[in-house]
């Protein structure tokens, strides 16, 4: 008997919604990244995108442990000389809370075209409302 290998056209993708309020950032990100890859499915194939769509709500209420709210720094560069920008967790959570979760999950996905396709299936929103009710996402407890 041969080993089963999933085909891209035969993959069934479900929609899930995850509430991030009160959840620890890293623990939430590892579970979401694993589901985006499809590692929870029996037909997981490393070279095929078998993951599900994940909608994360309440991104502004995600938690970190210890003093990371003031000590954890996020860096980006504008591309111009002297253009290194930095912000700590608390500042970024007030301005762009979606970016915190997206950056944490993106770092856990493969760094290739397949990883970018997986990342496109992630939808992050700061509040409780999201525009994906037509897809009837199932509640996912983490």
From Swiss-Prot:
GO cellular component: cytosolic large ribosomal subunit
General function of this protein: This protein is one of the early assembly proteins of the 50S ribosomal subunit, although it is not seen to bind rRNA by itself. It is important during the early stages of 50S assembly.
Pfam families in UniProt: Ribosomal_L13
Protein family per UniProt: Belongs to the universal ribosomal protein uL13 family.
GO biological process, one term: translation
Molecular function per GO: mRNA binding; structural constituent of ribosome
Quaternary data: Part of the 50S ribosomal subunit.
UniProt name for this protein: Large ribosomal subunit protein uL13
InterPro entries, A to Z: Ribosomal_uL13, Ribosomal_uL13_bac-type, Ribosomal_uL13_CS, Ribosomal_uL13_sf
Keywords: Ribonucleoprotein, Ribosomal protein
